[in-house]
Amino acid sequence: MGEEAIVLYPAPPIGHLVSMVELGKTILSKNPSLSIHIILVPPPYQPESTATYISSVSSSFPSITFHHLPAVTPYSSSSTSRHHHESLLLEILCFSNPSVHRTLFSLSRNFNVRAMIIDFFCTAVLDITADFTFPVYFFYTSGAACLAFSFYLPTIDETTPGKNLKDIPTVHIPGVPPMKGSDMPKAVLERDDEVYDVFIMFGKQLSKSSGIIINTFDALENRAIKAITEELCFRNIYPIGPLIVNGRIEDRNDNKAVSCLNWLDSQPEKSVVFLCFGSLGLFSKEQVIEIAVGLEKSGQRFLWVVRNPPELEKTELDLKSLLPEGFLSRTEDKGMVVKSWAPQVPVLNHKAVGGFVTHCGWNSILEAVCAGVPMVAWPLYAEQRFNRVMIVDEIKIAISMNESETGFVSSTEVEKRVQEIIGECPVRERTMAMKNAAELALTETGSSHTALTTLLQSWSPK
């Protein structure tokens, strides 16, 4: 048989892809003799956001090969009934199964495939992996607490017949603090949601895998990890995180990155609040204005990544017309506003940054932890409200941005939280402790290194 290989199958969004690539790099660092093959389904939106990244990885890591599948057009691509991106994503992945099967067949003929690792969203591929002999693992790109929820969701469904999660006052999940039903992942809040039953099925399928790899570490989510193995009775979990991108600046954004970092060089230590909300984090024009007013009133130094509102997403971003009149000139001594993108990891690791206003995407949380930067939690979509409860109430490395019932955040609230996170905030010390714990987990005797070693040994020829 040919060269030994590991096949990775990420979900298309950039955050999922980056996490899976980091997993591939980590596997290679421990076993360079392996080759990594990543199967790519074209993303249904913003395909340009992944193209340059993929090119960069390909040129830097010759042992990582990307296999691009043809684009598919799902039935719901033009549907107005879809109210979150998960439904489109799941349909595209399901429609891609025939192409995935052909790719796996080809890889199996040319390589000795030791294992396949799939994203949680790619569960539909289990329908075809039974045709092959290699073991299949899940890679869960959110935290262990969210994984515990996914395991327990079928039980919640059975024990609360007819009830929508959003209407349940308190939900109890093993290893997770009690939280409001409305804080559960958005896709499962209502039973008549088009993907609700799919997520129930996902929860039931988890235990059918050979194991689950989680991008977390024991000290960060010890209670949730323990609950999965003991209360939910699934022992083959491998918390091998934190897996985050390094601080290297992507070539396409060199000028913008250098500009951000040069500006930070001129700021006092731990004086700057960094506001960044991910590739899908969009605000209405009214909310953008409210953020601007709050930042100006706070008097704090800030670096703010601004994207176009949804209604203007396809137009050129004009900061002067989007922001309050005169805002840029009035705040130029204390603030910097950048369009669409900033080098998040280098920014978070800069000594001038003292706080991070984040959408609570799991990658961003881990990046902040590894940089020792406390967070202001402002969730926007997917499982981010769930993550907020975890980092505010359980792990205590963030404070919460409070919103109205409609999700709107006032300028006064922005002002208060920005001032609080830069001041003598109690979560700062806790965040630094977690930074140290993350570093320890990756050492030779650390929990994550041990979990990864155990996983790799299971793939070795018997």
Swiss-Prot record:
Signal sequence interval, chain numbering: none
GO MF terms, alphabetically ordered: quercetin 3'-O-glucosyltransferase activity; quercetin 3-O-glucosyltransferase activity; quercetin 4'-O-glucosyltransferase activity; quercetin 7-O-glucosyltransferase activity
Highest taxon, organism lineage: Eukaryota
Protein residues bound to UDP-alpha-D-glucose: 279, 342-344, 359-367, 381-384
EC identifiers of the protein: 2.4.1.-
Any Pfam family: UDPGT
Database matches in InterPro entries: UDP-glycosyltransf_plant, UDP_glucos_trans, UDP_glycos_trans_CS
Keyword Transferase among record annotations: yes
Record-level GO cellular component terms: cytosol
Keywords: Glycosyltransferase, Transferase
Protein task: Possesses low quercetin 3-O-glucosyltransferase, 7-O-glucosyltransferase, 3'-O-glucosyltransferase and 4'-O-glucosyltransferase activities in vitro.
Family the entry assigns: Belongs to the UDP-glycosyltransferase family.
Protein name: UDP-glycosyltransferase 88A1
Organism: Arabidopsis thaliana
Protein encoded by which gene: UGT88A1
